[in-house]
């Protein structure tokens, strides 16, 4: 079973940014990995394990914003269709090598 945590947290003030970052760190600490920018996923071996992690997400959720949790079976997860567009990375220029005689 897979847990998807999707969230939209305010990040206008310094405090809101801090709380949003703390929430992300708590998700990562609990074994979630970033699937998309505001979507984190985690595999759970059982329903009981999923409920434990749902409790942890609830306890670390900031008071403002929206957090949604979706439970997906392995079969449903295997049917996900990912469409990857071109990813642009900043090209790092190769430094010039100096020759000394």
Where are these regions (language model features)?
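Basic nucleic-acid-binding interfaces
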Residues: 2-4, 9-101
């Amino acid at each position: 079973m897979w847990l998807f945590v999707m969230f939209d947290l305010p990040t206008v003030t310094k405090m809101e940014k801090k709380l949003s970052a703390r929430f992300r760190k708590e998700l990562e600490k609990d074994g979630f990995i970033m699937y998309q920018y505001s979507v984190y996923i985690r595999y759970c071996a059982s329903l009981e394990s999923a409920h434990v992690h749902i409790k942890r997400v609830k306890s670390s959720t900031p008071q403002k914003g929206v957090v949604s949790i979706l439970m997906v079976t392995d079969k449903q997860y295997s049917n996900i269709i990912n469409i990857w567009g071109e990813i642009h990375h900043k090209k790092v220029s190769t430094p010039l090598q100096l020759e000394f005689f």
